[in-house]
Amino acid sequence: MVSQLLFPLFPPFPALTGPAPSSTIETIKLPKNTGGHSPPSVLQRSLPRENKRIVVKIGTSTLAHPSGLLNIRRVEELCRVLSDLKNAGHEIILVSSGAIGMGAGKLALPHRPEDTPTTQAAAAVGQCELMYTYDKAFAEYNHTVAQILLTAADVDHPDRFQNFHNTMRRLLDLKALPIINENDTVATEEMGIGDNDTLAAVVAVSMEADLLILLSDIDGLYTADPHTHPEATLIAEIPALTREIWELAGGSGSSLGTGGMSTKLQAADICTQAGCDMVIANGSSPSVLYDIADGKPVGSRFRGKKG
């Protein structure tokens, strides 16, 4: 049954597996909240390689103006920087939110839709605009993009997830730049992955990425919510996700998106358990990706478990 393939959000303090086994494969069990009807999904990731493959996730609030319409200048800069990183030898995978927000803006909706039919209609309109913009922008630098839309069932079903993995590997072999989003046109709240922070972490682990970068409208993880506590300070290095770190997660995200700091910490938990580093950084200037790729201290870096 479809209800047994759900991929809901994690509890506030995810109980993932303990220390990695001594073999060359790390196994991560993603906890479910399905009432015990189905076993947790399992992802496998080889031990870390050289720092080459990078997954970049950009959120709706970073892609769009407050009106919901696409921030064309920012998208063009993002595509220029990612193209340059590819030219430098990095393998880039982009997880892009924005379909619903873009569609809401193009349809002149007064706010992000709340009912399912309007949400899915906005996603259908917005995904077209989003991919058209990406395709045109990356073509300026002679890079070919590929669209991949996923649902929770694709992630949970072993055969479908293996097909996704095989396709992704072939796309990277062909030097294409995969652009991934949740398939919001068919996904519902009950059947969806929930947010692209989680999706990006699943992609990063399954594709054996060396680094996941979450570009947001905030500089990183703070000692308190900087929107309401101006005295809050940025935490540059997080070696472990302690209970104190989890308690720093504030409320939900912006009015345009679905992800807040709690979803970013959940993404960090998935990545770090698998040995993959993750960085939260402000995406208002995509050129910050250069410094992050070079290992410079930008935003908040969560260190992956090694060994």
Please provide the spans of the model-predicted regions.
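Short intrinsically disordered, low-complexity coil segments enriched in acidic
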Residues: 1-2, 188
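C-terminal catalytic "cap/lid" subdomain
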Residues: 7, 25-33, 38-144, 148-307
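Aromatic (phenylalanine/tyrosine) cluster motif
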Residues: 7-13
